[in-house]
Amino acid sequence: MKLQYKNGEEFFLKYNQFFHLVIALSLLPFGLIWLAKKKGFELTLPSETVGYVLYAVLGGIILFLFFQSIRNYKTGYKDFSKEWTLREKLDFFYSSNYKKYLGLGVATLIAVAGYLVDTSYFFIFVYVLLLFSMSIGRPAERKIEKELALSKEEIEEFRKAKEIQ
C-alpha cells in the first residue's frame, strides 16, 4: 500500500486516519450488537457442542491473525535499511503497520461476530484485549522516529511542514 503525502505532518495525519478507521470499523458493529442485545435480541446456538466448536474455531482464527500480524510486522524489519531516504523509510513504516493493523482489525471483526452468536462475555473480553493491544502500538511521532532510527536531520525534516524528498 503506497501512501501519498507531501510532508511529515500529512504522513502522520493519514497514518492516524487509517488506524482510527480500523478501530471504528469494529466499534460500530460492536455497539449496534450490544444495544440490540440489551433490547433482548439473541441468537441461540443449536447445542452446547456448537458453542464449544465456535469458541475453538473463532478463537483459533483470532489467535492466528493476532500472532501472524505481529510476526509479519516484526520480521518485515529484516529488510529495513538505515541508508534509505526519509520517504522510503516512511513508506516502509506505513506498509508494515498497514498490514499489522489490517490483520488486527479483521481479528476484532471476528470477535464481534463471535459476540453476535454467543451469550457469554468471552468474545467481549477477546475484543477488548485486541483493542488494548492495538492501542499499545498506536500511532505516535516518537514511535515512528524510534522504530525507523531517524537521524536528527531526518527528525527535523519529518517534524517540519516542508516537503519530504
Name the predicted role of every residue range:
Residues 1-10:
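Short, Lys/Arg-rich, polar N-terminal cytosolic tail immediately upstream
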Residues 125-162:
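Alpha-helical transmembrane segments and their immediate juxtamembrane interface regions
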Residues 91-100, 155-165:
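Cytosolic juxtamembrane regulatory segments of multi-pass membrane proteins
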Residues 37-47:
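Membrane-interface helix termini and inter-helical loops of multi-pass transporters
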Residues 32, 102-123:
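Alpha-helical transmembrane segments and their membrane-interface junctions
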Residues 54-73, 130-140:
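Hydrophobic alpha-helical membrane-embedded segments
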Residues 17-27, 95-104:
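Select subsegments of transmembrane alpha-helices in polytopic membrane proteins
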Residues 66-89:
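Membrane-helix interface/capping segments
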